[in-house]
Amino acid sequence: MITTVQAEISLRQYNDQFCYDGDTCYITINGMKKKIRLLELDTPEISKPKCNAELELGLKARDYLNDLIANASTIEFKTEYLEDYFGRILSYLIIDGEDASSKIVENKLGVVYNRKQKYDWCQDLKHE
């Protein structure tokens, strides 16, 4: 059963960034400060990277997403308001009519999220 819920959601900045990393952004929903986790996307870690290459690509992914948002004409959230283990709302982020997750994957700054296996950025980046 799908329930439609109306909510006031807006992106917010924290330390001059809209997004913490390439797949987590800051929002305000009905006046509460929360984070969203972009669905179907995995980007390199920046808080606890396993190698320098992972950190570098993670920062590029974050900066790319922040630039997309800063230059957007329209921003939409598509979510069922489900939360992940860390309390982030799982959501699609649509920027100017395009799925942000898809754009990040197309630009080789992330991969499609796989629940069964964590992507090994250091192993993959070693071969580039």
Describe each model-derived feature in a short phrase.
Residues 1-128:
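Small beta-barrel nucleic-acid-binding modules, primarily SNase/OB-fold domains
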